[in-house]
């Protein structure tokens, strides 16, 4: 995931690669930053395209990491801000995206990158509602190493798929 002024090109490449390589299952994943106010529409487009072209969608859902930079750049360049200015709207869109992914699990694999307890509980409830096994390989919980360990460890202990992600590189870059 990158800033909005870079992400569209990444999205185009990721979609082309999903269409080419995700014929039987998701191998290629892209990140959706749900603090962007256009991501639900993007997700809906991606789901429609995957159905039409018969490929699997691989997604990591996150809230977003470049909020201040996005707002500043939009002001500097004079365009509409591409991110939600209220965190509640980001939370709403994150949970909506999570719901859309689980409702379309027949052709979606999702990694729920969240430190938010409510979204984690929602994912568990959605899996139960749709009779999806806790250890279904299409669904993962993910948290940054050293953060929200209570979510990671409790979900793993309960039998859910959990990964910790580790930023790599100089501290100033990660």
Regions from the PLM with identified roles:
Residues 1-174:
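Positively charged, amphipathic and often flexible ligand-engagement surfaces
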């Amino acid at each position: 995931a990158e800033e909005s002024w870079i992400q569209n090109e990444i999205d185009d490449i990721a979609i082309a690669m999903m269409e080419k390589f995700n014929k039987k299952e998701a191998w290629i994943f892209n990140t959706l930053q749900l603090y962007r106010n256009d991501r639900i529409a993007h997700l809906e487009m991606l789901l429609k395209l995957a159905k039409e072209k018969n490929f699997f969608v691989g997604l990591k859902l996150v809230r977003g990491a470049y909020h201040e930079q996005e707002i500043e750049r939009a002001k500097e360049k004079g365009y509409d801000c591409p991110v939600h200015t209220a965190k509640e709207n980001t939370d709403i869109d994150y949970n909506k995206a999570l719901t859309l992914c689980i409702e379309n699990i027949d052709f979606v694999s999702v990694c729920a990158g969240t430190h938010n307890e409510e979204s984690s509980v929602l994912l568990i409830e959605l899996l139960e509602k749709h009779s999806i096994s806790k250890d279904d390989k299409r669904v993962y919980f993910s948290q940054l190493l050293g953060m929200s360990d209570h979510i990671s460890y409790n979900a793993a202990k309960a039998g859910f798929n959990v990964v910790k992600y580790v930023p790599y590189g100089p501290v100033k870059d990660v």
